[in-house]
Amino acid sequence: MAVSPTAKRKFHHPFRNLSRQSSSARTSAEAPPLPAVDQVLGGSADVSGGDQGGPGNTQPESPPAPLTRPPPPPPIFGSFSSSTCSFQSSISQEDAKPPYHPDTELKKVSRSLLRLQKYSLILGFVSINAGFIWALWNYHHYWYIFLPFLAANTFCQVIFAISNTIAATFTTLRRKLGFKKDVVPENPEKFVMVLPCYNEDRQEVETSLNSLINQQNIDEHPRLIMVIVDGNAKAPGEEVSTQDFLLNDMFAGGERIEFQNGYSARDGFFMPVTIQQGKYRGVPYIIIGKKHNQGKRDSLCFVRSFLWHYKNRSADISTMFNPDLFDYMGSILTDNGLDTIDYLCGMDGDTVFDDDCVYELIKALRRGGPDVVGVCGAVLVKFDEKPWGWWSVPSSQPPFFAWFTETNLRNRNLLQNTEYNLTQGLRREFQSRVSGKVNCLPGCCQLIRVQDATFGDAVLRERFGHVPKPNDTMTQQIMGVYSEDSIHASIIFSRHPKSQTRQALRARAYTTAPQSWSVYLSQRKRWALGSKSNEFVMVFRPGIIWVERLCSFITVTTWWLGPFVVAAMFGFAIALVRQGKKIFENHIMIGLMSVLAFRYAAKEKFKEKMPPV
């Protein structure tokens, strides 16, 4: 049996080991001081001996030294003692163990179970769509039989548009009449801004960080930036890994401590972690550098579980964290005025916030009341001042050849932006205004309350952080890897049915579209499989309201019958060519076309016209 890469890591017993690198610290302390910065930059550093520059000594004039910048300051390896820190806890660390026993699991059912499920689903997908297409072409006179499958999603979105209009009008009237006012708490909320990284380049990370620093109207809120880096991957074109340039360049000079046993990762092994703290442009930060790659979900479990146990002041329980690491990070928060954490603000390494994005998220969460546990913003494509064309064709290439050139294709930006508008439009706005159950809080722009309903162990560790076993079903395998944002929301609704989520359209974030077709298609595969698997499970998951069950059923059915829907569109085009304007003499056809026009017009205008919730 092949051994997975993570299985090569050795188990470490839960001991408190802090690597100090004292020898390097002593070496740097004994070294002569560096010349002043202005001397180095000016090329006038005096490197000659003290008695060689007297009046009687004439030295040949040497050429001026080249202009160089001083190296970044070395990290300060701190000395941490749990007994003297400002924050202390009584938690213990759970034992290191794999999430399942491979031999036992593989003996229960054959390893070909997933392969059997895969080909069975493909066979069913092809057979059902082929049967529907055959029936459509041979029995098109019975069109009313096929109408529910073709028009169910469209009619649902028309209902969404009408409901959104009524709800928005009602909300506007209540605000103008003074029945609904914004409540500002006496003590500003305290929150942590989390930035997960993997292989982002220097410019992407710096742009994202600066957008967090430049947020307006939140100066009175105590806050901290928490950057967690998953492994040591390099970005294309970078000489060092993302973790290296974050620790040693962008955040150089901070206090650093290394934990050989930091926490128990999702695979059951102890993860070595590097913690660095300091201030970035006046805002306190913590960098959490994981030695091994365990995926974004593992990083989210670490940060969210830590914030919950820190706020809850968990005592005498077993957690994933090394007690020394937990106390050290808790001391950093306490020393920076965050004795409690109200919110977690999440973004991605390739995302840029509007200047008032976080403020709009906070306002939306306040307006919802205590039952609203999370808010997401409006995610748009960052076009980087490029034209809106489908693609750009250089003059040196023929247009037809350039159409097949991956680096010149521009339509993925437009497709990405269109998909964002569709997903954030009618249904998500309906979920925000009417049902109160936005079933996806995108990780690139979200604000979540730190409480048991969102980050408690029952939600986070037992369900969200579940590692699929080899013999789990295909749906469980997909949900254990993809679409962590929508899966987290559905788990919250299932275990805490009274919890609600919202969407704040005025909180805007801009992301970079995939830069190649291979990455774009890979993203589509992950999003489609993850979201549709979650929609399928929501049909049967306990605690989900009936409206969301019905919408999920219609969404999954329409997606499953995609080839049949495309074939019906071709059939309509052929009928339009053959019959011409006679086809519009049918009143039912006119009604269907009007419904489609209303649907797309409503999607196009939802962001500009909708007032805040």
Curated annotation (Swiss-Prot):
Record flagged with keyword Methyltransferase: no
Primary localisation category: membrane
Swiss-Prot/TrEMBL catalytic activity: [(1->4)-N-acetyl-beta-D-glucosaminyl](n) + UDP-N-acetyl-alpha-D-glucosamine = [(1->4)-N-acetyl-beta-D-glucosaminyl](n+1) + UDP + H(+)
Organism: Verticillium dahliae (strain VdLs.17 / ATCC MYA-4575 / FGSC 10137)
Transmembrane region(s): 119-139, 142-162, 556-576, 583-602
Protein name (Swiss-Prot/TrEMBL): Chitin synthase 8
InterPro entries reported for this sequence: Chitin_synth, Nucleotide-diphossugar_trans
EC number: 2.4.1.16
Claim: Ion transport is one of the keywords in the record: no
Annotated function: Polymerizes chitin, a structural polymer of the cell wall and septum, by transferring the sugar moiety of UDP-GlcNAc to the non-reducing end of the growing chitin polymer. Plays a role in cell wall integrity. Plays a key role in pathogenicity. Likely contributes to post-penetration virulence.
Ranges of Pro residues composition bias in the record: 61-73
Gene Ontology CC entries for this record: cell septum; plasma membrane
Membrane topology annotation: Multi-pass membrane protein
Pfam family, one: Chitin_synth_2
